[in-house]
A protein has these predicted regions:
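SAM-dependent methyltransferase catalytic region
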Residues: 2-117
């Protein structure tokens, strides 16, 4: 499946990729791994990661997805401080129903209301 992705997805970090059923991140980590080949600094890593997005329904899968992203980065780079990278990961990879997601504002459209009376 990944063979069908355009090659510039890996080299042009302005290209956005969203996995609507991210699972534990197999596809996202593959794309990230290919992008990391063109990174030389933490800033490059953040740029490569900042246009990757994933939505997954199962919370435990999202936790594993985020760990897999960190592990993918650690296989290629020695990172001492993950704060900036974690900010991107926590913002871009979310637990939600893909069909109830507002992509323009990157937030859930599911409205829950609590009765006031």
């Amino acid at each position: 499946m990944c063979d069908n992705l355009p090659n510039d997805l890996y080299t042009d970090f302005s290209k956005t990729f969203c996995d609507p059923c991210a699972g534990i991140g197999n596809i996202i980590c593959y794309v990230l791994s290919e992008r990391l080949k063109y990174c030389k600094s933490e800033k490059d890593i953040i740029n490569a990661l900042s246009t990757l997005y994933g939505v997954e329904l199962m919370e435990d899968n999202v936790d594993e997805l985020k760990d897999n992203i960190r592990n993918t980065i650690c296989l290629k780079f020695e990172i001492n401080n993950f704060d900036n990278i974690n900010n991107v990961i926590n913002n871009n990879f979310v637990c939600s129903d893909f069909f109830e997601w507002d992509f323009e504002n990157w937030r859930s459209t599911k409205i829950t209301s609590n009765a006031l009376f």
